[in-house]
C-alpha cells in the first residue's frame, strides 16, 4: 500500500523532504511523459499514460500534508475519511461555527480585511495541526492522527472558501 512512497523512493512517513519529492516528481514526469512514447506501440503508449497518471496522483497525494497523512493511515488499515469517522470534539465544533460565522459576515459585508485575518488564523491552525500530525505519527497514535486528518480536511475546505471570497 505504500506504493506512492516507493514510487518516489521516500521512506513512508508524515514528515518528508518536499524538495526531494518535487525533484523526483519532475524526473519521473519527464521520464514517463506520454509524448515520449508517441512512436511506441499502442501497449507502451497506454502503459506510459497509466504510469503518468499514477505519478501525478502520487505527487498530489504526497505533496498535500493532509492527503499524505490520510494515505499513511490507509497503509495502516485506517480510513480517516470513512463515514463512521466523521465526528469532531465539541471544542472543534464550536470553533468551526465561529469561523463559519466570521466567514459569512465578512463575505456579506465584503470585508476583505476580515477575510484576510481569518485566512491567516486558519493557516496558523493548519501549521499547529501539521505539528500535531507529526507527533501523532511519531507515537503511532493513529486514532488521533485520523481525527487530525478530518480537522485538516475542514480547514482546507474553509481556506478554499475564504480564497474564493477574496
Swiss-Prot record:
One of its GO terms (cellular component) is iron-sulfur cluster transfer complex. Residues 3-75 form the J domain. Pfam families: DnaJ, HSCB_C. Keywords: Chaperone. The keyword Ion transport does not apply. GO terms for biological process: [2Fe-2S] cluster assembly; protein complex oligomerization; protein folding. Belongs to the HscB family. This is Co-chaperone protein HscB homolog. It comes from Neisseria meningitidis serogroup A / serotype 4A (strain DSM 15465 / Z2491). The gene is hscB.
Amino acid at each position: 500500500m505504500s506504493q506512492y512512497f516507493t514510487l518516489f523512493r521516500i521512506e513512508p512517513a508524515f514528515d518528508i523532504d518536499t524538495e526531494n519529492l518535487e525533484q523526483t516528481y519532475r524526473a519521473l514526469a519527464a521520464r514517463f511523459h506520454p509524448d515520449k512514447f508517441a512512436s511506441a506501440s499502442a501497449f507502451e503508449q497506454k502503459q506510459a499514460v497509466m504510469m503518468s497518471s499514477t505519478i501525478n496522483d502520487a505527487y498530489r497525494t504526497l505533496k498535500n500534508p493532509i492527503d499524505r497523512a490520510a494515505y499513511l493511515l490507509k497503509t495502516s488499515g485506517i480510513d480517516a475519511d470513512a463515514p463512521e469517522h466523521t465526528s469532531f470534539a465539541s471544542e472543534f465544533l464550536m470553533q468551526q461555527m465561529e469561523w463559519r460565522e466570521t466567514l459569512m459576515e465578512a463575505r456579506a459585508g465584503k470585508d476583505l480585511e476580515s477575510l484576510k485575518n481569518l485566512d491567516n488564523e486558519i493557516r496558523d491552525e493548519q501549521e499547529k495541526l501539521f505539528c500535531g500530525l507529526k507527533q501523532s505519527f511519531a507515537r503511532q497514535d493513529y486514532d488521533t492522527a485520523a481525527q487530525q486528518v478530518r480537522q485538516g480536511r475542514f480547514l482546507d475546505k474553509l481556506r478554499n472558501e475564504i480564497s474564493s471570497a477574496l
